[in-house]
Amino acid sequence: SSCNSKKYLEDDQSFLMSNKIKIKSSYPIHNKSEIKESFLNYYRQPQTKYALFFPRHVFYYQYQEKLKAKPDHKKWDEERIIKNRPVIYDSLKAEQTSDDFEKYLQLRGYRSATVNYEAKTEKKVTKVLYQVNPGPRIFLDTILIIAEDSMLQEIVDKTKDNILIPPESA
């Protein structure tokens, strides 16, 4: 059928149909929904988008077939083709996404964060589950700067009120 876009895939290919995130930790996570929302910016491969209950790539392949049949057919502008281009699952990009999620968390105080992913492929459709364990969050309570040079310590003591880290961000 014209809707079966799987026929265009190679034997080792599948469509990426979903990216899910599961955040679980034995430590309190105060901003779970904010973390999930921020992760949306770090996907190396976004999941397939839908239009009228059909994956967008169905329209992409239908358009490609029309072009083969009628080469002089008016071409879509490049932007529309890109929007409907199929998302083929790439395990390297899933691994990079996991690494990016970990780095994001580590920069926000979750120094022992771990992120693993599991990809399940069935009938040329892949679903990826990212399992996120932020671990404990580290907060700075006190920053103490001690200089062995008394002149340097005097400069540090004079400038300690001009700190760049506001107390409420700790």
Model-predicted segments: where are they?
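Interaction-mediating elements
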Residues: N4-A170
